[in-house]
């Protein structure tokens, strides 16, 4: 209990809500889930596996991973070429994550400019994400819980501190 999350599972106590932290947005996520196979209204987002799919070469993945760390105020590898990383980011990432990396709740694209990292902020963590993508899941609870229980759960999750 408490919603603190762990690597790969979101912290419900912070302000980093992939799909929005209002009561209505939380309720929609609880009702329909994320990539739930049994709900046509489930929330879906898909980041390409840029490395695995051959969109980016290994050195380009590393450049963009360093650039992402730099916009989040984190250290980068020695010799990192920020201009090259920025160009790769602009061409491949900005459409979803925004020019400044602030994310897009409508798409479920996380904020890359804050200190909150669902899968880790290390260079190898980011390289892994850019190379192979990530696809978190959450079941749709509308078929398992009655509407009153979902509303109660919505209010509880919102009260943990991260809701807006």
Q: How does the language model describe each region?
A:
Residues 63-88, 164:
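Electrostatic cytochrome c docking/interface patches
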Residues 3, 36-38, 74:
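Secretory-pathway/luminal and periplasmic proteins that interact with or process carbohydrate-rich
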Residues 35, 70-73, 91-94:
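Short helix-capping and hinge/turn segments at secondary-structure transitions, especially at repeat
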């Amino acid at each position: 209990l408490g919603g603190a999350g762990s690597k790969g599972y979101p912290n419900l106590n912070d302000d980093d809500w992939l799909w929005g932290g209002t009561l209505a947005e939380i309720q929609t996520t609880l009702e329909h889930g994320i990539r739930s196979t049994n709900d046509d209204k489930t929330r879906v987002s898909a980041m390409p596996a840029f490395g695995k799919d051959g969109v980016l070469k290994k050195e380009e993945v590393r450049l963009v991973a360093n650039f992402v760390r730099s916009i989040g105020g984190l250290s980068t590898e020695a010799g990192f070429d920020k201009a090259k990383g920025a160009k790769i980011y602009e061409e491949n990432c900005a459409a979803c994550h925004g020019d400044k990396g602030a994310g897009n709740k409508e798409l479920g694209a996380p904020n890359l400019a804050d200190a909150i990292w669902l899968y880790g902020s290390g260079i190898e963590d980011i390289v892994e994400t850019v190379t192979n993508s990530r696809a978190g899941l959450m079941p749709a609870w509308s078929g398992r819980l009655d509407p009153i229980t979902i509303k109660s759960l919505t209010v509880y999750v919102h009260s943990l501190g991260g809701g807006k």
